[in-house]
């Protein structure tokens, strides 16, 4: 190592020339040993010509090797389907951070643990849920994404891609970019592409339709619902300006007493019950429509791969007030397909009950 104030280690000494000595010249005086010492250099590092340079410091130890990757599980996790993933780095990064989509029961139990104060402690709860795949939309394709997710519960002979749903919807004139502002058009698209039964429900999710919806869900069939989406994806009331689609695949029902037999209490959450798979069970009594906080829909939508639990009355009220086309969409310069009569005629108070064809397995 060379200091900024370093100098040559060997002093500059004139070379010694060996000549024949002159006997008349007296011998030189002996050198005084202290005169052999070199003056100290004008810097903080003192170096003697008789001492070697100190060895350089050892190199730093290499970092420890990374931990080995976890052993693969017996069942490979199913990652959410992301439409447009190949073209979106943002979606790729989000998907890598999020990991596999959780199963329905486990995701609902996570919600119950996080928001336990939201659910009435004076009731026991029965959870009916079916596992849906997750699909993240790209652009205004929330309705078609919801339909694609619902296909998993419809025993469709051949899987239909989201790209195929978009293509057919455009060819039939139901959409320009993937948007769906007509529940009736969605029903026709589902019948054609998924070969399923599609029942158009009018008049809202309350009144006599309420029991039909609940019976449909506890049987394990999907329900497509248009609603106004809040910032957290939950239902709100924006007069249709935030119109969005979700697919419901289950329901959480609060009851005074759990019917027996056919239900088993959850091992982690006391007071939560599940129907025993494959065992006959008596359907529970549905809570009165006027009973607050006793009924929640289990839903998914195209902006998250997690299930969400929504208060049934909030979904009902949001679905009933879809009346206007968004002014922001009207001014964005894009083309949208809106049915005659507008958003109110196409979405307000409507939902879609989907079932497999008779004889399907």
Curated annotation (Swiss-Prot):
GO terms for biological process: protein processing. Its EC number is 3.4.11.-. Residues 134-254 are annotated as: Peptidase C39-like. Its main location: cytoplasm. Keywords: Aminopeptidase, Cytoplasm, Hydrolase, Protease. Residues 1-75 are annotated as: Disordered. GO terms for molecular function: cysteine-type aminopeptidase activity; initiator methionyl aminopeptidase activity. Interacts (via N-terminus) with PFN2 isoforms 1/IIa and 2/IIb; the interactions may facilitate efficient cleavage of the acetylated N-terminus of immature actin. Interacts with PFN1. Actin maturation protease that specifically mediates the cleavage of immature acetylated N-terminal actin, thereby contributing to actin maturation. Cleaves N-terminal acetylated methionine of immature cytoplasmic beta- and gamma-actins Actb and Actg1 after translation. Cleaves N-terminal acetylated cysteine of muscle alpha-actins Acta1, Actc1 and Acta2 after canonical removal of N-terminal methionine. Belongs to the ACTMAP family. The N-terminal proline-rich disordered region contributes to the interaction with PFN2. This is Actin maturation protease. It comes from Mus musculus.
């Amino acid at each position: 190592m060379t200091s900024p104030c370093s100098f040559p280690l060997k002093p500059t000494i004139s070379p010694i020339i060996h000549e024949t000595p002159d006997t008349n010249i007296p011998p030189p005086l002996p050198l005084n040993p202290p005169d052999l010492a070199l003056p100290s250099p004008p810097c903080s590092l003192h170096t003697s010509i008789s001492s070697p340079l100190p060895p350089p410091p050892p190199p730093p130890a290499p970092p420890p090797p990374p931990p080995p990757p976890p052993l693969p599980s017996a069942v490979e996790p199913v990652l959410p389907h992301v439409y447009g993933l190949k073209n979106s780095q943002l979606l790729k990064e989000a998907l890598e951070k999020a990991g596999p989509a959780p199963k329905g029961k486990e995701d609902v139990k996570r919600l119950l643990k996080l928001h336990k104060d939201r659910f009435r402690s004076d009731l026991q709860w029965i959870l009916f849920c079916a596992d849906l795949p997750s699909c993240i939309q790209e652009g205004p394709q929330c309705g078609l994404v919801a339909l694609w997710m619902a296909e998993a519960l419809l025993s469709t002979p051949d899987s239909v891609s989201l790209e195929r749903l978009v293509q057919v919807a455009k060819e039939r004139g139901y959409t320009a970019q993937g948007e769906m502002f007509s529940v009736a058009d969605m029903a026709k698209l589902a019948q054609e592409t998924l070969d399923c039964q599609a029942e158009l429900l009018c008049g809202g999710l309350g009144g006599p339709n309420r029991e039909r919806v609940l019976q449909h869900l506890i049987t394990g069939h999907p329900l497509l619902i248009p609603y106004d989406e809040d910032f957290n994806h939950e239902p709100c009331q924006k007069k249709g300006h935030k119109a969005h689609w979700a697919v419901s695949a289950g329901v959480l029902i609060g009851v005074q007493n759990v019917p027996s037999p056919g239900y088993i209490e959850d091992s982690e959450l006391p007071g939560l019950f599940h129907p025993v798979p494959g065992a006959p069970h008596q359907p529970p009594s549905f809570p009165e429509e006027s009973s607050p906080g006793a009924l929640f829909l289990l839903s998914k939508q195209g902006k998250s791969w997690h299930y969400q639990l929504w208060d049934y009355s909030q979904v009902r009220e949001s679905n009933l007030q879809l009346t206007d086309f968004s002014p922001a969409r009207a001014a964005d310069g894009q083309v949208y397909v809106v049915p005659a009569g507008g958003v109110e005629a196409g979405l307000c108070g409507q939902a879609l009950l989907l079932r497999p064809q008779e004889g399907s397995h």
